[in-house]
């Protein structure tokens, strides 16, 4: 389930972002143009020779106004904390610098796999210059040009060779979930409170592909859960811990590892832009989503309308998460925390739900009878049949005479009718229009 993480590290102007975009290529998917669904390129999914992985551009993380060398060191620390493999990018035009040497020493001591990319080797004459980089003690330097795509195959071959073996995780039958959100919404308190409620902790196990600690526990009814990356949430004192981009990156990593994500909001502070960015990534990833409003106990002037008003605000600001259940909790007083495991399990089951084709088509035909298909330029959309082709998230192919005739509003109507007929609360569902051959 969890993709390996590759971090790109290096001093400014060596071409980190260009290399990042070259590897990510067109694989950064834009699902829909919806307000709040961000397109930040600090994090992307990529693939090479059938190996899927996630990339983080540490250079995109804003780390205060520290001196340059301090910033680069902090990039290296982030990469060491988060990544399975590190691409250290240097620049053939400037040769080996003091900054390169200091960061190389940090990376070398980390015992994390490091692949050294010497960038801007735009012509064969520059290839001989890369041998100076053996002095960094990081093994073979790979000559690349991220602008022209030269040497990318050899570089990526070296990267995927370092990926960890995930085979040991195949038999894990627990539900993986995580709390995600911006700093100071109470994720750490929720983690501790949940583990306090569920005292039967099975084990603390090393994460599948990295050093983070995932906590497994079992509820009284025997359901097994794995809380993803609790160690990462508990880490304190890092100079970059409260930067927005680092928080966003950590959330995206947790999303990758989870069946269900719990987007945590702070009842005291309301909804911020970063909340919407993080929730947008959860939506795009296609995992199960629950919205958790924490610190509900801190609102002193509550009445019977307060929860309704806050719910309406969430539905307005997170329109793309209309399917996500909302729960109001307090990590401090334990209010409603006992409901969370059951809600997580429910969303997990909806995320894996499969509908028989005959039953699905009855729903589609009833929907079309109640609201006939639209016409465009004298041509009417014809819906022949539908079938479910995947779960996690549930994905349906709808066979039609011409996909161009399926207006977005009618597609949304069909989705709503499917949701009315079957309980898919907490999970996105995808409809794919396909022309019948």
UniProtKB/Swiss-Prot annotation:
UniProt-recorded Gene Ontology molecular function terms:
GTP binding; ribosome binding
Q: Which PANTHER family does UniProt cross-reference here? A: GTPASE DER
Q: What is this protein called?
A: GTPase Der
Function in brief: GTPase that plays an essential role in the late steps of ribosome biogenesis.
UniProt binding sites for GTP 1? 10-17, 57-61, 119-122
Instruction: Indicate the segments forming the EngA-type G domain, all copies.
Output: 4-167, 175-352
On assembly, the entry states: Associates with the 50S ribosomal subunit.
Sorted alphabetically, the Gene Ontology BP terms of this entry are: ribosome biogenesis
Q: Which gene encodes it?
A: der
Give the Pfam families listed for this entry. Answer: KH_dom-like (PF14714), MMR_HSR1 (PF01926)
Which NCBIfam families does the record match to this protein?
GTPase_EngA, small_GTP
Q: Which family does it belong to?
A: Belongs to the TRAFAC class TrmE-Era-EngA-EngB-Septin-like GTPase superfamily. EngA (Der) GTPase family.
Would I find Nucleotide-binding among this entry's keywords?
A: yes
InterPro entries associated with the record: G_ENGA (IPR031166), GTP-bd (IPR006073), GTPase_Der (IPR016484), KH_dom-like (IPR032859), KH_dom-like_a/b (IPR015946), P-loop_NTPase (IPR027417), Small_GTP-bd (IPR005225)
Where the record annotates domain KH-like, the positions are 353-437
Q: Which SUPFAM superfamilies match?
A: P-loop containing nucleoside triphosphate hydrolases
